[in-house]
A protein has these predicted regions:
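Structural beta-sheet core signal
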Residues: 2, 28, 114-118
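Catalytic histidine-centered segment of alpha/beta-hydrolase-like enzymes
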Residues: 146-159
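Conserved alpha/beta-hydrolase catalytic His-Asp/Glu region
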Residues: 38-39, 55-108
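Gly/Ala-rich beta-loop-alpha elbow adjacent to hydrolase catalytic centers
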Residues: 3-12
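Flexible "cap/lid" loop of the alpha/beta hydrolase fold
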Residues: 17-53
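Alpha/beta-hydrolase-fold serine-hydrolase catalytic core, especially in secreted/extracellular enzymes
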Residues: 171-180
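Conserved serine/cysteine hydrolase catalytic core
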Residues: 92-133, 142, 151-152
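Short, hydrophobic alpha-helix immediately C-terminal to the catalytic nucleophile
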Residues: 12-17, 160
Length: 180
């Protein structure tokens, strides 16, 4: 099973489209399907760099201003990211991520075993329709009342159990917050 969230989904999609390895299931958090023009990506890079670095400088104090939460369980990861981030690395990542271009094609059989989760309250929900058009055989659960990556951060055990259910039974479990 391939699991991808946020910008890391670019790597997972490259893996799915460029490898000969068999993948039975994939799960994507829909936030990574934002499509932003090249000029806009160039403009936002220095601001994003400053925002991420500020997480290190403020010991996580700016997290709530940048992201939807300031959960103590994720602060150490963002602080470390802010400490280790270089402008060059971010520029390279942004230059080949979030591109405003067609999604790569995937075989129908693989699409049937891919889950593209979108939280209902995140800005990236607006990209759901484009993903549905690109992959018409995929599965598109909506996590009602959730933001980008919020379920996996607040309930990692429940998230892991959900992924195990998908791998074992080829379907989403019945969860009270899932809208189809």
């Amino acid at each position: 099973m391939v699991i991808a969230s946020s910008i890391g989904a670019d790597l997972a999609m490259a893996f799915l489209t460029q490898t000969k390895l068999s993948v039975e299931h994939a799960f994507f958090d829909g936030g990574q399907f934002a499509q932003i023009g090249k000029g806009t990506r160039r403009i936002i890079t220095p601001f994003l760099y400053f925002a991420i670095r500020s997480l290190y400088w403020s010991k996580g104090g700016t997290l709530k201003k940048i992201l939807w939460c300031d959960d103590d369980s994720i602060k150490p990861y963002f602080i470390a990211a802010g400490k280790n981030l270089t402008y060059t690395d971010l520029r390279r990542q942004i230059s080949d991520s979030l591109e405003d271009k067609p999604f790569p094609s995937l075989p129908e059989e693989l699409q049937r075993n891919i889950y593209f989760e979108f939280g209902s309250i995140k800005d990236h929900f607006k990209y759901r329709q484009a993903v549905m058009e690109a992959y018409p055989y995929g599965n598109y659960p909506v996590f009602e009342g959730y933001d980008h990556m919020q379920y996996q951060i607040h309930n990692p055990k429940g998230f892991a159990e959900m992924l195990a259910h998908i791998a074992e039974r080829d379907c989403m479990p019945e969860l009270p917050f899932i809208r189809k």
